[in-house]
Regions:
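Divalent metal-coordination and catalytic microenvironments
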Residues: 17, 28, 53, 65, ...
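Structural detector of well-ordered beta-strand residues that form the stable sheet scaffold
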Residues: 26, 73-75, 125, 162
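Core dinuclear metal-dependent hydrolase active-site scaffold
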Residues: 16-18, 93-118, 123, 154
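Active-site-adjacent loop/tail segments of enzyme domains
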Residues: 133-159
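Active-site HxH/HxHxD metal-binding segment of metal-dependent hydrolases
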Residues: 9, 23-24, 31-105, 191
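Active-site metal-binding loops of divalent metal-dependent hydrolases
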Residues: 29-31, 54, 78-79, 110-111, ...
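Conserved beta-strand hairpin/beta-sheet module of binuclear metal-dependent hydrolase folds
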Residues: 1-44, 115-129
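Accessory terminal helices/loops
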Residues: 150-160, 169-266
Length: 266
């Protein structure tokens, strides 16, 4: 299984999964034309489309792809809207011949139905986990997102993480602000700046790397927790409240409008 990044829209990535005998699948096609061009350039045949969630920038290329390749579309059962032909429940597995076996993990938070797709040492995580960051909580609760991030953290350290956007440099700026003495973040900033200057993606990343640099996976680290408490003006916070404080802190840092805190959804 060979995985290629296809940049689309302003900062999205479509992941092209190349298997044997010219078979391929794509994850989260936000556009069709660049994906079709890359499939043709590599002389491949599209066998399936995989979706992590329903946002348009991850699925608005489905129609154009299916007009050329009438293939099945695998996606979250809780968001099985227009395009999903094969809804996936939590822990459901499916096989794509000559490509691989995939398992769906329900990872809500960014959306209520969001899934991540796990296969052969790779995790396609959509907008749940970014390198040095995580998705905004448009529908899910802090409890849900933290549980999703903890679940992804249980993957082996060598797992490669394929996220949906090129957000790494911006995320690292906040990570360094929150943890100024974290040398792993400083080194990663250098590496990402070099990669981006060369026109290369900053992702995939590894779970091992994310545990060192991603503040949203590190809320229980004493030094970061102290910074979160100081920012909140509090002596004690639950893990979910600490996560939410950190998420809002990053939104303030990025000058983004604050989202409401949603109640736990079951």
């Amino acid at each position: 299984m060979r995985i290629h990044a296809i940049p689309v829209l302003s900062d999205n990535y479509v992941w092209l999964i190349e298997g044997d005998q010219g078979h391929c699948a794509v994850v989260d096609p936000g556009e069709d034309a660049p994906v079709l061009a890359e499939i043709e350039r590599r002389n491949l045949t599209l066998m399936a489309i995989l979706l992590t969630h329903h946002h348009a920038d991850h699925c608005q290329g489905v129609a154009g792809l299916r007009a050329r390749f009438p293939v099945p579309v695998y996606g979250p059962a809780l968001e099985a809207k227009t395009w999903v032909t094969h809804p996936l429940a939590d822990l459901e597995t499916f096989d794509l011949p000559h490509i691989g076996r995939f398992q769906a993990w329900h990872t809500p938070g960014h959306t209520l139905g969001h899934i991540s797709l796990i296969s052969n040492g790779a995790a396609f995580v959509g907008d749940t986990l970014f390198s040095a960051g995580c998705g905004r909580l448009f529908k899910g609760s802090p409890e849900q997102m933290l549980a999703s991030l903890d679940r992804l953290s249980s993957l082996p350290d060598a797992t490669m993480i394929y996220c949906g956007h090129e957000y790494t440099a911006d995320s690292l700026r906040f990570a360094h602000f929150a943890e100024p003495n974290n040398e792993s973040i400083v080194q990663r900033i250098r590496e990402v700046n070099e990669a981006r200057a060369a026109g290369l993606p900053s992702v995939p990343t590894s779970m091992s790397m994310e545990k060192q640099i991603n503040p949203f996976l590190r809320i229980r680290e004493p030094s970061l927790r102290a910074a979160i408490l100081k920012h909140a003006g509090s002596e004690s916070l639950s893990d979910a409240d600490a996560f939410w404080t950190l998420r809002c802190w990053k939104d303030e840092f990025d000058d983004l409008p604050l989202l409401p805190r949603h109640a736990q959804n079951h």
